[in-house]
Amino acid sequence: MMSESNKQQAVNKLTEIVANFTAMISTRMPDDVVDKLKQLKDAETSSMGKIIYHTMFDNMQKAIDLNRPACQDTGEIMFFVKVGSRFPLLGELQSILKQAVEEATIKAPLRHNAVEIFDEVNTGKNTGSGVPWVTWDIVPDGDDAEIEVYMAGGGCTLPGRSKVLMPSEGYEGVVKFVFENISTLAVNACPPVLVGVGIATSVETAAVLSRKAILRPIGSRHPNPKAAELELRLEEGLNRLGIGPQGLTGNSSVMGVHIESAARHPSTIGVAVSTGCWAHRRGTLLVHADLTFENLSHTRSAL
């Protein structure tokens, strides 16, 4: 058992770690996003597309040089936490994450993006009722905490949709739903976008899964071979739309398509789509029981 003074020191230390990490990912793209954008840039053949990709990389470099957010919309901060039941600060983690967001808002700085519903007042701290949003997965007997930070920008959040299909619509209905949403809405989401598809029973379970899907490293595949094949076929088909970087036409519309799924009710197919923009700001931090940590998503950047 920690003494109260030692626990407070540990709380302060972890708060600082998470705050620094959150501020850092506002200025730097994760390794896989940079690599994918470079791949798309090298493959682009349209003159306008080449100019847009050049501007994107110039923007990313200036963000690093000036230590300023890569996009002025630093989003609403969300955390997806996979934590062991024996992690020493499990009981304090919710408040740690909230305090870390408030500190990162000043350090980065982050744009103020938390508006209280009905009052329509911006809190000015990026925290508020239910914000930061935290999704929990508890691992029995584990003592590490894997903290995924996601900055949900307005533009890339707007195309999000969820629907419950009749089972007779089948996977063809899922594909139709994805294409209808991306073809009509992704143009305003700062493409090329990363597409997350959730398939489950209801709108809420599918929606959470679709968000988790865009947290996976780009190009990772669903463990079910049939789902993995559908990911690839959707990616190929969506790229044929020719939306291109920033919606100005080009070879690629998406950085990738990821599917997350859960067993469904026999009478329903819940499907949801979430998108991440080209400036896909998310990061994965692995914190051990002794509060040493590993930056899993930004191996080329030091905290």
Curated annotation (Swiss-Prot):
Stretches assigned to coiled coil: none
Which signals induce this protein? Induced by tartrate, via TtdR.
Cited InterPro entries? Class-I_Fumarase/Tartrate_DH, Fe-S_hydro-lyase_TtdA-typ_cat
> From the Swiss-Prot or TrEMBL record, what is one GO molecular function term?
metal ion binding
UniProt: iron-sulfur cluster binding residues: 71, 190, 277
What family does the Swiss-Prot or TrEMBL record give for this protein?
Answer: Belongs to the class-I fumarase family.
**Self-association and partners:** Tetramer of two alpha and two beta subunits.
Quote the protein name from its UniProt record.
Answer: L(+)-tartrate dehydratase subunit alpha
Question: What organism is recorded for this protein?
Answer: Escherichia coli O157:H7
User: What are the leading ranks of the lineage?
Assistant: Bacteria, Pseudomonadati, Pseudomonadota, Gammaproteobacteria, Enterobacterales
